[in-house]
Curated annotation (Swiss-Prot):
UniProt-annotated stretches for the region Disordered: 20-110, 147-177
Modified residues annotated as Phosphoserine in this record: S23, S25, S27, S106
Family assignment from sequence similarity: Belongs to the GKAP1 family.
Protein name: G kinase-anchoring protein 1
Organism, as annotated: Homo sapiens (Human)
Coiled coil: 47-77, 128-160, 243-353
Residue ranges with Polar residues bias: 39-50
Length: 366
């Protein structure tokens, strides 16, 4: 298929494609110059020329294969591309006269420069063509914007009317509605008009690659829109018949979902209840432990208090005993004091009586 497409579609070659890259030996081009040279030099030149020819043939074959692959890919991606066949380029290259071996070296040296320039020029041309194609597409869209908007509005209005009619009929009847022929033909007529207008404008412009590509893309988009419209109409016809069943299925699905949610919530509640019972048991255990600790602390405190009270009682009893002893000793001391006073008084009396006796005796003696 690819070869047939390549043979049928013309291809455009680069303006440097006709440069002679492959050439034969120097004996064919200039037979009279090599007669005066030595045999050894001719043999070395012949071997070098054969090796160069083989290398050039390989390069040429590789280039032809690459060009053919690129053309096949272009034909597969873009069905209509103006290109020339690679066979014509090859024939033109073979028809050119063969160059001298001295010129071959210079051409080989300059070939890379020529190729770079060719690539730059082709890239610049490609960018310019892209810009032109984009500008043309924008201009076409702006020119026919009103027509596109009118077509879209009519299609949307027809869709809305059909949906309303189908809803009304669905309320009274379950059978689906069909699209009217007038609406269908009107949409087909509008799409055909848009296609004709786009095709006429594209023919008026230059028949370049990118313009045709834009036309193909526009046509494909219109076809896809038409297909979508047809699928929507057919879908709306079938939807009215299946809406009731879908509602029933949705209700059943909702009921099942609610049941599943209830079961899941019941399981969660049961888990929470189990957790609560476990925590209650732990709380009771902790409470009992705390009560035991309180009792132990209270008992320890009571023991300490009882010991202190006993010590206080003992001290008080000792104090009482000591006070009693002190009082008794104080009373005995007072008694002793009184006795001493009495004795002192008696001594004083006794001494006074003895002095009076002495005085009387002294008087008597005198």
């Amino acid at each position: 298929m690819a070869s047939a497409v390549l043979s049928s579609v013309p291809t455009t070659a680069s303006r440097f494609a006709l440069l002679q890259v492959d050439s034969g030996s120097g004996s064919d081009s200039e037979p009279g110059k090599g007669k005066g040279r030595n045999t050894g030099k001719s043999q070395t030149l012949g071997s070098k020329s054969t090796t160069n020819e083989k290398k050039r043939e390989k390069r040429r074959k590789k280039k032809e294969q690459q060009q053919s692959e690129a053309n096949e890919l272009r034909n597969l991606a873009f069905k209509k591309i103006p290109q020339k066949s690679s066979h014509a380029v090859c024939n033109a290259q073979h028809d050119l006269p063969l160059s001298n071996p001295v010129q071959k070296d210079s051409r080989e040296e300059n070939w890379q420069e020529w190729r770079q320039r060719d690539e730059q020029l082709t890239s610049e041309m490609f960018e310019a063509d892209l810009e032109k194609a984009l500008l043309l597409s924008k201009l076409e869209y702006e020119e026919h914007k009103k027509e596109y908007e009118d077509a879209e509005n009519t299609s949307t209005q027809s869709k809305v009317m059909n949906k309303k009619d189908k809803r009304k009929n669905h309320q009274g009847k379950d059978r689906p509605l069909t699209v009217s022929l007038k609406d269908f033909h009107s949409e087909d007529h509008i799409s055909k008009k848009t296609e004709e207008l786009s095709s006429s404008q594209t023919l008026s412009h230059d028949g370049g690659f990118f313009n045709r590509l834009e036309d193909d893309v526009h046509k494909i988009l219109i076809r896809e829109k038409r297909r979508e419209q047809l699928t929507e109409y057919n879908g709306t016809d079938n939807c009215t018949a299946h809406e009731h069943n879908q509602e029933v299925v949705l209700k059943d699905g909702r009921i099942e979902r609610l049941k599943l949610e209830l079961e899941r919530k019941d399981a969660e509640i049961q888990k929470l209840k189990n957790v609560i019972t476990q925590w209650e048991a732990k709380y009771k255990e902790v409470k009992a432990r705390n009560a035991q600790l309180l009792k132990m602390l209270q008992e320890g405190e009571m023991k300490d208090k009882a010991e202190i009270l006993l010590q206080v009682d003992e001290s008080q009893s000792i104090k009482n005993e000591l006070t009693i002893q002190v009082t008794s000793l104080h009373a005995a001391l007072e008694q002793e004091r009184s006795k001493v006073k009495v004795l002192q008084a008696e001594l004083a009396k006794y001494q006074g009586g003895r002095k009076g006796k002495r005085n009387s005796e002294s008087d008597q003696c005198r």
